[in-house]
Curated annotation (Swiss-Prot):
Keyword Ribosomal protein: no
Compartments, record wording: Cytoplasm
Family matches, as Pfam families: DAO, Methyltransf_30
Organism this protein belongs to: Chromohalobacter salexigens (strain ATCC BAA-138 / DSM 3043 / CIP 106854 / NCIMB 13768 / 1H11)
EC number: 2.1.1.61, 1.5.-.-
Cofactors demanded by this protein: FAD
Family: In the N-terminal section; belongs to the methyltransferase superfamily. tRNA (mnm(5)s(2)U34)-methyltransferase family.
Official protein name in the record: tRNA 5-methylaminomethyl-2-thiouridine biosynthesis bifunctional protein MnmC
Function: Catalyzes the last two steps in the biosynthesis of 5-methylaminomethyl-2-thiouridine (mnm(5)s(2)U) at the wobble position (U34) in tRNA. Catalyzes the FAD-dependent demodification of cmnm(5)s(2)U34 to nm(5)s(2)U34, followed by the transfer of a methyl group from S-adenosyl-L-methionine to nm(5)s(2)U34, to form mnm(5)s(2)U34.
Gene (UniProt): mnmC
Catalytic activity: 5-aminomethyl-2-thiouridine(34) in tRNA + S-adenosyl-L-methionine = 5-methylaminomethyl-2-thiouridine(34) in tRNA + S-adenosyl-L-homocysteine + H(+)
Family annotation (NCBIfam families): MnmC_Cterm (TIGR03197), PRK01747.1-2 (NF002481), tRNA_MNMC2 (NF033855)
Length: 699
């Protein structure tokens, strides 16, 4: 039967290592007390890295000869101080062609605190520039994948957690391995058969490895996993080390228990058309252009004209009390978006990391938040609970309710962000509306028919048109529901009281920007009218005054008019999936899935071996709902990474959770799937078939 997902652990901060600082031949160096071992050679750690890992994998010659369009991928067990990865980066820049790209993947169970990392890397002043880039993006110690762009050509994916477990969930293939970590005698838990099997599973044919140790457990583990090894001279006092390769690793693409999620094989990506220039589309376009792909961005209006055209949007997420895939995706997305925005706009012209307070004004939400805090233990810099007094101090106004504080979250200008992304080098903007898509098998290309009669051709097409995606024939049946949301804009004078945080409850209010206070937003599933309504302004203002009564009264005292008839605003449509998670990935061939997996409707235990069939080069990013600022940039990386044959920025099961075919396979199993172009019902058993009455929802 379809695989049962492994239980997801709580969202917690990883423990830091127990460190001592001991003098060596160069300076004071970190020493792992729990393992009784050093992080790098006391004599010359950088020289050891060069000898063992860089030369052991023949990186200078391989980089110099690299001509493939995909990135060269290095995998590492044990990031430690990052010395190995920084040396690989330096070697790549010295030897690789200008158009080559490098992708680094490293695991770490006990991430160093940032100040300890800085102290360790300060031993080598000539590495300060690269170390500074790493330190500026150093992630919080949260288990999972953290993607860092070290340069325009170099990406680092940090997988925080146990090495074997993290590699078993890696979605990607590796060209060269740095098999590092504390010695097998002092850290036997890492050097287990599961580690070597996971390495083999995600190795490309001919992948190499190098390691400092010749321990028997390592030689046996490598051999049993399919690697061949040989002894070569070691570094310094170590007489020998191991190098080797794996000629024929297993096919990592195929999902044995969920074959429908088998990723499509890579195809050339000379030209990609992205349809839709909201945040989903512009994020994908920019991610592809960053990788050197020629992109045409097709939009019937200006970039950011739809639901992404709001003046301000809250950058935060609402995490479930119990761990689920959706919460893990959104948490990873929130952390990625913050790093991404920091690199994109360090002056914060497009965003502010002022923090977000998610209040609990009623017993139900207060109970839910208490359950969350009891189950999870994230770093305080990411999320922590606050009482009403602490929340009041953080917000800069009296509050009556406790809540959750996201100190690194904030607000973003989605309209300006879309415009900046659309103007990225490598993107050609095209004004027009796509009528339909058709794959020309003879030309091995997509033809995009425009309403003006013209046609575009492309190797790949990414559809990012929110609830309108199913109007394209290959996406007919993709369950998406339009949701109307209206924001209210209240003019405020420069000397009016101000908020220090975005405050969310039933609705939200952001700190005033350019003399306007933005609050909302209404939530009306199934309503597609975008005309601004005074009644919705009234609803937003009622929610605002109920959530922030003292602040509302202070505004009135300052002469601010809170009259719905005098307010301006904006209404737009966002899209949601039935399970409230985004779609990001390849588009399944619906009729093929109905045929290939029909047996599941009679017996879910009879899983066919047939790999899922997808439309070649067709992708979708949609259903970002009211959390698109946290999900769209990371989903763009998911699509760009898969399209460019790179390791993905999420665990394998979370990639599958985002798959656009997840509802289709669920309906096949339940016997609810339909043939033809009929759109699946987007209602859950408890949903009303008619458009819901307007309510308010935090963005």
């Amino acid at each position: 039967m379809p695989a049962v997902s492994r239980p997801l652990p709580p969202l917690t901060a990883l423990a830091p290592p127990e460190l001592e600082w001991r003098a060596d031949d160069i300076s004071d160096a970190p020493y792992a007390s729990a393992y009784g071992d050093v992080y790098f050679s006391r004599h010359d750690g950088r020289a050891e890295t060069g000898h063992v890992f860089v030369e052991g994998n023949r990186l200078p010659e391989r980089f110099a000869a690299w001509r493939e369009t995909r990135a060269f991928v290095i995998g590492e067990t044990g990031f430690g101080t990052g010395l190995n990865m920084l040396c690989a980066w330096a070697c790549f820049e010295r030897h690789a062609p200008a158009e080559a790209r490098l992708h680094l993947v490293s695991t770490e169970k006990y991430p160093l605190p940032r100040d300890a990392l800085a102290r360790a890397l300060a031993i080598w002043p000539d590495m300060a520039a690269r170390a500074g880039v790493l330190l500026d993006q150093w992630p919080e110690p949260v288990g999972g994948v953290h993607r860092l762009w070290l340069s325009s050509r170099v990406v680092l994916d940090l997988h925080f957690g146990d090495a074997a477990e993290r590699l078993s969930r890696l979605d990607g293939r590796v060209d060269a391995w740095f098999l590092d970590g504390f010695s097998p005698a002092k850290n036997p838990d890492m050097w287990q058969p599961e580690l070597f099997a996971a390495m083999a599973q995600v190795s490309r044919p001919g992948a190499t490895f190098a390691t400092f140790t010749c321990a028997g457990v390592v030689k046996r583990g490598l051999r049993d996993a399919g690697f061949t090894w040989r002894k070569t001279p070691g570094f310094g006092r170590k007489r020998e080390m191991l190098c080797g390769e794996i000629a024929a690793p297993p096919d990592d693409r195929r999902r044995a228990s969920t074959p429908w999620f088998t990723p499509p094989r890579a195809r050339p990506a000379r030209h990609v058309v992205v349809i839709g220039a909201g945040l989903a589309g512009t994020s994908v376009a920019a991610a592809l252009a960053r990788r050197g792909v020629a992109v045409t961005l097709l939009e019937r209006d200006a970039p950011g004209a739809g639901a992404s055209g709001n003046r301000q949007g809250a950058l935060y997420v609402k995490l479930a009390a119990e761990t689920n895939p959706q919460s893990r995706v959104y948490l990873a997305g929130l952390l990625y978006t913050r790093r991404w925005l920091t690199a994109l706009d360090p002056e914060q012209r497009l965003w502010q990391d002022c923090g977000v307070l998610q209040l609990a004004p009623g017993d139900k939400e207060a109970t839910r938040q208490q359950r969350f805090l009891a189950h999870h233990a994230l770093p305080e810099r990411v999320l922590h609970g606050v009482d009403a007094a602490t929340a009041s101090q953080a917000a800069g106004t009296p509050l009556d309710a406790p809540g959750l504080d996201y100190p690194q979250a904030g607000w973003v200008r989605p309209d300006r962000l879309c415009q900046q992304l659309a103007a990225s080098p490598g993107i050609t903007q095209r004004r027009g509306e796509a009528h339909d898509l058709d794959f020309d098998a003879d030309a091995d290309a997509w033809r995009i028919a425009l309403t003006d009669g013209s046609t575009l051709t492309a190797d790949h097409v990414v559809v990012a048109t929110a609830h309108e995606a199913p109007r394209f024939t290959p996406l007919a049946g993709l369950p998406l529901k339009p949701i109307r949301g209206q924001l209210t804009h209240v003019p405020v004078p420069a000397d009016a009281p101000s908020l220090a945080r975005v405050v969310c409850a039933g609705g939200y209010v952001a700190p005033a920007m350019e003399g306007v206070l933005s609050l909302g937003a209404t939530f009306a599933p199934g309503d597609t009218d975008t005309a601004v309504r005074t009644t919705d302004h009234a609803r937003n203002l009622d929610e605002f005054t109920a959530t922030l009564p003292a602040f509302a009264e202070a505004l009135r005292a300052a002469g601010v008019t809170l009259d719905p008839a005098a307010c301006e605003g904006r209404a737009s449509l966002r899209a949601a999936s039935p399970d409230k998670s985004p779609y990001a990935g390849p588009v399944p061939v619906r009729e093929a899935w109905l045929d290939d997996y029909a047996v599941l409707g009679a017996d879910a235990r009879r899983v066919p071996s047939t790999a899922g069939r997808h439309h070649p080069g067709l992708w979708v990013s949609a259903a970002h709902g009211s959390r698109g600022l946290a999900s769209a940039p990371l989903c763009a990386e998911v699509i760009a990474s898969r399209l460019c044959d790179e390791p993905l920025p999420l665990e394998r099961e979370l990639i599958d959770h985002l798959h656009p075919g997840r509802r289709l396979i669920a309906d096949i199993i339940r016997g609810n799937a339909t043939r033809g172009n009929a759109t699946l019902s987007t209602s859950s058993p408890n949903d009303d078939a008619q458009p819901s009455p307007t309510t308010t929802e935090t963005p």
